[in-house]
Amino acid sequence: MNPLKNTLMALLVLFTLSLSTQSYAELAQQVDGVTTIHLDQYGGYFETKETLAGLKAGTYEFIITNKTNKLVGFQIQNNKTKEQLDKFPLEPNQTRTSKVEITADGFRFRCPINPTPWYEIDGVK
């Protein structure tokens, strides 16, 4: 085979693999003025399907799913004033929704039962 052709094929394969392994967070969807954020809670940490960058003040619906085999919880506060916005327990595999008003102060959330660090989101516009 032609060495140039082999090199081009190898580069094409590497480029294709690099595209297929990149993952992009979804943008938060807004319906009827409410922005939805999905949070999956695992043992000691949260994962989100949507990016938390560039959020705007407004009404948010957090859909939290307990992905562990034990009782956990969800707590959300105003990031500046530490005002409690919502707090509740989640049984294993349970999903609950928290609808809150987020201001330009930002917000922070954590599990108050299974110690996790505060996830502080202060870039809300």
Regions found by a protein language model. Give the residues of each.
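Surface-exposed, proline-enriched loop/turn segments that connect beta strands in immunoglobulin-like
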Residues: 49-51, 85
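Sec/Tat signal peptide C-region and signal peptidase I cleavage site
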Residues: 21-25
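Beta-strand cores of secreted/periplasmic/IMS beta-sandwich domains, seen most often
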Residues: 51-70, 96-110
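Short, solvent-exposed loop/turn elements at domain surfaces
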Residues: 44-48, 71-74
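Surface-exposed loop/edge segments in extracytoplasmic proteins
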Residues: 73, 81-88
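Bacterial N-terminal signal peptides that target proteins for export
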Residues: 2-9
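Bacterial N-terminal signal peptides
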Residues: 10-18
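Extracellular/periplasmic metallocenter environments
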Residues: 26-47, 90-125
